[in-house]
């Protein structure tokens, strides 16, 4: 069984998606701990409702960034965490955590990387006028949404889309492909080779999902 540690800053809808997929039996995993940098995060309520241990770790209570991430890494190691899930963790992860969990930290980003990294990927896509948008599960490195790509899924982007309408469409795919990425990892079917993530699977499990035709 895979042991997960989750980092979240806000509502934690992807955290809930992982919980639901564990309960359904799709994922052979358990969540050992939720770590949040926000004492008001709704993710805390989700953890409480599912009897998941929660640690509220506020960066300003640590002398500097590295000590904060060393402490997080220590807490995860204490609980024998195999894979770290970033479920809306709104900080750039520090080197001490990345080094101790190399290729064992996954993030989901609401855009088709390498396009539109950073904050508000959906808004960037709407303003740019793209015809296809989507989401990306990737391993975390020291950059901002620059780590090796694991899975992507695409959705149509319409001319009358707002940030909210596009976000809603993308979020449904986030809740589908993040659990899939965790499942592939748990089954030992993911290998990293340079910038490429190789997946031992049927092709349809790893490709971009083709969006339907636009509204014409």
Predicted segments with their positions:
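N-terminal Rossmann-like dinucleotide-binding module
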Residues: 1-42, 46
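Internal anion-binding site segments
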Residues: 5, 120, 194-216
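Donor/substrate-binding cores of folate-linked one-carbon enzymes
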Residues: 21, 87-200
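Conserved acidic residues
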Residues: 32, 82, 103
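N-terminal glycine-rich "phosphate-gripper" loop used for MgATP/nucleotide binding
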Residues: 36-37, 60-61, 65-69, 79-95
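Short, structured coil segments at secondary-structure junctions
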Residues: 50-51, 101
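Short beta->alpha connector loops at strand-helix junctions that form conserved
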Residues: 55-60, 108
């Amino acid at each position: 069984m895979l042991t997960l540690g989750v980092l979240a800053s806000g509502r934690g809808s992807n955290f809930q998606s992982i919980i639901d997929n564990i309960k359904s039996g799709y994922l052979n995993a358990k969540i050992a701990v939720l770590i949040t940098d926000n004492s008001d995060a709704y993710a805390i309520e989700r953890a409480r409702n599912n009897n998941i241990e929660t640690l509220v770790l506020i960066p300003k209570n640590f002398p500097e960034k590295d000590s904060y991430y060393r402490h997080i890494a220590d807490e995860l190691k204490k609980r024998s965490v195999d894979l770290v899930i970033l479920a809306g963790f709104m900080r750039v992860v520090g080197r001490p955590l990345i080094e101790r969990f190399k290729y064992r930290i996954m993030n989901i980003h609401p855009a088709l990387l390498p396009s539109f990294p950073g904050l508000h990927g959906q808004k960037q896509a709407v303003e740019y006028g793209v015809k296809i948008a989507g989401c990306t599960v990737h391993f975390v490195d020291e950059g901002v949404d620059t780590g090796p790509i694991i899975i992507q899924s695409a959705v149509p982007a319409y001319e009358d889309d707002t940030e909210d309408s596009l976000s809603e469409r993308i979020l449904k795919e986030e809740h589908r492909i993040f659990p899939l990425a965790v499942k592939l990892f748990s089954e030992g079917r993911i290998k990293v080779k340079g910038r490429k993530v190789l997946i031992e699977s049927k092709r349809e499990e790893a490709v971009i999902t083709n969006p339907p035709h636009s509204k014409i």
